[in-house]
Amino acid sequence: MSEKEKESHKLGLSVGSSFQNTQELRKVLEQSISREEEVLTASQPVESEQNKEESQVAGEEVETEASAGTLSRLSRSGHRRREKVEARSKDQEDVEELLEDQEDEKSLGRYATKRPVPLSLPIAFSVLLGLVHVALPFINLLATNQQTQDLYAGWAMSQGQVPYGHFFGVNGLLYYGISALGSLVGGQILLVVFQILAYFFAGTSLYRMVRSLVASEKIAGQVQLLFYLLVGVLGFGGNYAVFYSLPFLFGSMNFILAYLEGEKTDESFASYGAGACLAFMMVPWLSMIFYLLAFLGLTAYHVKQKKFAHGFYQFLAGLLGFSILFYPLGYITVWNGSFGYAIHQTLYSLRSLQFDAGHLFANLVYYCLLLLTLGFASAFVMSFRKVSTSGQRMIRFVSCFGLLLVVVIVVGTPEQGAYQFLSLLPFGLPLFALWFAGEESTYQRRKVKNNSIWYLYFFSQAFLPILAMAYLVGYPVVNQFVLQNNLANERSTIAHYIKSHSDSKDTIYAWDQTAHLYQESGRLAASALLTPTAYLGPKENRTNLINQIKQDKPKFIVVNKDLDVTSAMQKVLTQSYEKVNQKGSHYTLYQYK
């Protein structure tokens, strides 16, 4: 081999070895670069440590201070991303729970009218309240003037008298028919049965209405229980005409809610009109206010939805249903000649409004205290929260304006009494339901454990409802059996004297606070206005009272010494009557000369 060939061979070996070394170096560099890329995509500190170990195996020369800083920053960013993912998952769970609750509420509102109503509570409270009835002898002593007049009405009709003619009647004809039937059969015990049925159907109708209104069976049951509590304290002893109208008023509210949900047809408004007629035949003035407001609310709804033809057709259907029942019942007053008197007397609450200084201040203070302590004012204010359905807006409109109108009428009526607030129940109870529903949703959003409605009703009002209820029940008992016990005994003595010194055809008149004396003595009244403390607001009624006494010439007139005698009445007593010697300090007995 020549020298040139040897040099070429050496050069080839060196180039080959250099090329081999270059390939090995390239492999090492590629391995280190791949390890670094894996580190950059890592999200956990543990993974970065593993990559670090792998890179150390490949070669410690690849590691630098810059890669360590990069690993630290990537670890922190991965931790932040994990926190964001966890927060989003929690928010998603809350949204899913809220959607589930809304779906449950929608399904409940859709099928509310088809579910059975729990009957244990309405049956128990209806029987309990029905047994505390003024038709029973012991409870009769606690009856108010209005209750005694209504009891007299039923008894007088069983004696052949007619309402609006022989006695002044502010209630509907159907109510007086129920009172007469109760007096004819079973010695007024049947009145207790009628009252129990009225309580029961009013409570069940209220439950259905509230359940459809707020889509909550829990609130429906609580408002139903509140209804029985208010009925017990405001209408202690029962026998008020409002009780018999409540099933129809609550039923009409439920009908409106069902219609707005698309569950009622236009033709079904005939049944709505029939219910309105039955309510009108119980309490005319209250029913007029309710159905007038309902008509305005439905009209506004039809105008907004551009359903003018539907609204007109529904009005005709409702008018037909009303007329089918009204004409046969109203014909009774035409037949006995009292139709004109019936219209005049049943609207007494609207005609007798007097806003003078005589009784206005006393009524204003008394009824404002009841509004505040029983929670009606709170329910009115809290019901103005945002509502979500057209049914809630409709019922809130009717209830708010109805509550205001009834309060104005009650304040302007001369006759004062807690029983006047019974007319607030068809308007106040839906507002209570809206109030409770709003508070319950607030509790659910804030996840508050103590979400009891009774805690809200009593505690938020400083337990004033408890004090008001205790007063309304306790005062009549204390007044009758402690403060005026001698008065009741003396009245019974005079009633026995009248019964034994007069014939069954003789009439009497009681210038007293109640109409107890007539039934106790078994004698009819000489005037359609049974007492001087009721229905004498208009001047014409005061004039009619004196004229009827002069014309009928009652054999006995009993005067309560605690009541002022008008000059016209005193003149009649002086000219035509003489005193009868009777022991007692509360009454004076006069006999016709």
Task: Specify the residue positions occupied by each region the protein language model found.
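Transmembrane-helix motifs of polytopic, lipid-linked glycan transferases
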Residues: 193-215, 251
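Short acidic/glycine- and proline-prone juxtamembrane loop motifs at membrane-interface regions
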Residues: 235-245
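Short periplasmic/luminal acceptor-recognition loop of GT-C membrane glycosyltransferases, typified by
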Residues: 482-536, 545-566, 585
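Membrane-interface transmembrane helices that cradle and orient dolichyl/undecaprenyl
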Residues: 214, 252-271, 377-391, 436
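Perimembrane helix-loop-helix junctions
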Residues: 290-320
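Hydrophobic/aromatic-rich transmembrane helices and adjacent perimembrane loops
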Residues: 413-456
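Membrane-interface alpha helices of multi-pass inner-membrane proteins
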Residues: 267-288, 404-410
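Transmembrane-helix signature of polytopic, membrane-embedded enzymes
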Residues: 206-231
